[in-house]
Amino acid sequence: SARELALSALHQLRERDAFAQDIIAKTIDKSRLSREDRAFATRLVLGVTSTRGTLEDVIDGCMDSPDDAAPAVRDALALSAYEIIFLQKSPHAAVDQGVELVKTVAPRAGGLANAVLRRVVRAKEHFPFGDPRTDIAAYARLHGFPVWLAERLIAELGPEGARDFMVASNEPAPVFVSVNAVKASEDEVVSVLAAAH
């Protein structure tokens, strides 16, 4: 599944201390999943990676003993928490799928996952834990930024510049196409791209 593939990529990122795009190219892009599932897995990996600090804070606040959870379990919880908090996934579905995902790496941790993810769903009601209009820490959490980085951005760019930077950092990158005029005309490339979409 897309979630299991994303979880595998997150595990490799943690173990190898590699770049997300390199792991995505080696695992997700070469998988036999549908194009939509590969895109979803990629979105999950990039989303969890970019919001990891915020997700870890939320998960830690929802666990009685955060240090006791194995790294693979924390990866699965982070993936599910990302879906709940940042993708606004249906809470019931996110908890059920998150429990199943955790069980793929720790079969006996289903109860823990259920309890933690239900708490994440409840915590989401108060997320980002403050008023983002007046509280920079809440604004940072809302955009998945570590608070220390938000504070540094304010020092460098001012409050408005820091807010603009955080918003822009979460926008999807634009797609550009370069046409090799020796191999195809611009019209041919446009036609091929239109047909592929």
For the regions a protein language model found, what residue spans apply to each?
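Class I Rossmann-like S-adenosyl-L-methionine
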Residues: 1-197
